[in-house]
């Protein structure tokens, strides 16, 4: 989708999208005729960022999520790289399943740790 379509679908302004791009939170998947195009991951990130912005969170504050995701991806890569080096469909499928499960577990851990860290405010 185009930047205009992404803004319309996510509720972002063009300036907000530009800020998200500047901080490396939303990336174009490809460029066609010099125009950037965005994929469904960009739409999801843009929509979630728009939701955060409604609470006064600025794009620069969201960089921590990008940094954490990059670190987590690097860690997962280390874990599944031996499977991917085997170069067979079964190992590739096992690597994908491992990443999916680790992602699910990591999401649960983050949620539990955040709840624990904020417990005094939530009770």
Where are these regions (language model features)?
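Arg/Lys-rich, alpha-helical DNA-contact motif
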Residues: 1-8, 14-18, 22-123
């Amino acid at each position: 989708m185009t930047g205009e379509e992404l803004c319309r679908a996510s509720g972002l302004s063009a300036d907000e999208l530009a800020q998200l791009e500047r901080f490396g939170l939303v990336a174009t998947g490809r460029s066609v005729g010099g125009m950037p195009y965005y994929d469904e991951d960009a739409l999801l990130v843009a929509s979630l960022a728009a939701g955060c912005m409604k609470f006064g969170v600025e794009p620069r504050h969201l960089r921590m999520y990008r940094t954490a995701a990059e670190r987590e991806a690097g860690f997962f890569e280390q874990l599944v790289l031996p499977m991917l080096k085997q170069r067979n469909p079964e190992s590739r499928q096992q690597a994908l399943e491992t990443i999916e499960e680790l992602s699910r577990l990591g999401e649960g851990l983050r949620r539990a740790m955040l709840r624990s860290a904020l417990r005094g405010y939530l009770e």
